[in-house]
């Protein structure tokens, strides 16, 4: 990343978890004024970006001034250390993003966009918008895709970007796709404020933040 210094970078949540862990470790090792400034930078950023801009409101003048100061110092240094100072768009998907990670990333001025999608949906089904998104959601459904919540709160998809079936696997296709075109994702979720939230995998597998698959029974024994 430091060699490329991308303007756009797709990632899984685990990447941001490592960034967050590294920052927390640095804060814990630091003392005095430096530590106080680092903590205040995160607090100011949370107010500026989450409490105000996220809700379409203008931050207080004093908060704006503090944010601009930290933007040129602490936020800038953090981004340069990671190698993303040129970045302006960071799609993230593949697993759930913990709320504390989501809040931290936005607090330091990183434009992380959380999305949801599958191979069978030709990738993105929904994603968060710059304004009005709820922490913990995977955003609003993209145009051209239908989403409904079925039995057991399963997320069902339909649309031109959704697969018509699995190659030479008639039984798997019949099991996954209803006659009227609704595709069973195996993911459970719900809608709130027009945004999609994921809750769990209905099937016997779940995704970890590294996007590997783990069998639930292995954890129960």
Residue spans of the language-model regions?
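Alpha-helix capping and helix-loop boundary segments enriched in small/acidic/polar residues
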Residues: 7, 210-211
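Conserved small/polar residues in nucleotide/adenosyl-binding loops
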Residues: 214-221
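Gly/Ser/Thr-rich phosphate-binding loop
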Residues: 2, 7-10, 21-133
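Alpha-helix/helix-capping structural signal
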Residues: 14, 95-96, 161
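Conserved ATP-binding/catalytic segment of the ANL
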Residues: 141-208
